[in-house]
UniProtKB/Swiss-Prot annotation:
This is Small ribosomal subunit protein uS9. GO terms for cellular component: cytosolic small ribosomal subunit. Belongs to the universal ribosomal protein uS9 family. Residues 94-133 are annotated as: Disordered. Keywords: Ribonucleoprotein, Ribosomal protein. Residues 114-133 have a biased composition (Basic residues). Residues 95-113 have a biased composition (Basic and acidic residues). It comes from Synechococcus sp. (strain CC9605). InterPro entries: Ribosomal_Su5_D2-typ_SF, Ribosomal_uS9, Ribosomal_uS9_bac/plastid, Ribosomal_uS9_CS, Ribsml_uS5_D2-typ_fold_subgr. The gene is rpsI.
């Protein structure tokens, strides 16, 4: 990567994962925490598709490299965070990209997270066995 090339940044979050995504002009390679993207995501096709989805929505999958620093959570949360971060970086690239990404749902934060455990219960909603007598 040359020093004068343009870099677009985006931050994504999902569950407890946070991803800092950089879009750099290139040939479509994905690097996550210094490792190849498919290797990092255990060659899982749904995770890889989620990461590539924003670029494929705009037809730019072979024009930009994705460089990611991600931490927290598991692979599901991390791939979702990378997807949102890449979409935000694409919005920084051009304001015209926002509408198609928004209609596909790549820009919205998924609010689903682990529910906290309550006292008196075994798990978030599982109650101890009820005995009538």
């Amino acid at each position: 990567m040359s020093n004068n090339s343009v870099v677009y940044w985006g931050t994504g979050r999902r569950k407890t994962s946070v991803a800092r995504v950089r879009l750099v002009p290139g040939n479509g390679t994905i690097t996550i925490n210094g490792r190849p993207g498919d290797n990092y995501l255990n060659y899982n096709p749904s995770y890889i598709a989620a990461v590539k989805a924003p670029l494929e929505t705009l037809g730019l999958s072979s024009e930009y490299d994705i460089l990611v620093n991600v931490h927290g959570g598991g692979l599901t949360g991390q791939s979702g965070a990378i997807k949102q971060g890449a979409a935000r970086a694409l919005c920084e690239l051009s304001a015209d990209n926002r509408k198609p990404l928004k209609t596909e749902g790549h820009l919205s934060r998924d609010p689903r997270a682990k529910e906290r455990r309550k006292y008196g219960l075994k798990k978030a909603r599982k109650a101890p066995q009820f005995s009538k007598r």
